[in-house]
Amino acid sequence: MNKFTPALILALAAGTFAGSSLALTSAEYSAARDRINADYKAAKAQCDKLKGNAEDICEEEAKGKRNIARAELEQQREPSDKNARAVELAKAKATYEVAEERCDDLQGEAEDRCEREARAAYDAAVERIRGK
């Protein structure tokens, strides 16, 4: 079994390096951007069927998904620590924006507490991401 270990390690390493060098062509990138925008428009159209704060929450969710998808696309196009952090920040921001919108369903002290908790969670996530 030990005879296969170095060969396996070399094969895995070669596969990893080969896979990481596959960049998106400009046509693939453009098609992915178009797909992200089309998905966002479709999601937003679904949100328009809702009323009140439910519509606002739905729109924030759609924006968040779009922004996360864009950040992931950039990471796929040009993998880097900076782009990986941008993906994590987009996720944290989307979670925060939706949570803040959900707080609007509450009133008074409950709303204030909800907003403080959402902000604290967002700040902690940003701190963790930037600390990497």
Stretches found by the model and what they are:
Residues 1-8:
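Bacterial N-terminal signal peptides that target proteins for export
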Residues 4, 22-23:
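Serine/threonine-biased, Pro/acidic-interspersed low-complexity stretches characteristic
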Residues 13, 18-21:
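N-terminal signal peptide c-region/cleavage motif recognized by signal peptidases
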Residues 24-27, 31, 38, 42-60, ...:
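Surface-exposed, polar/charged faces of alpha-helical domains
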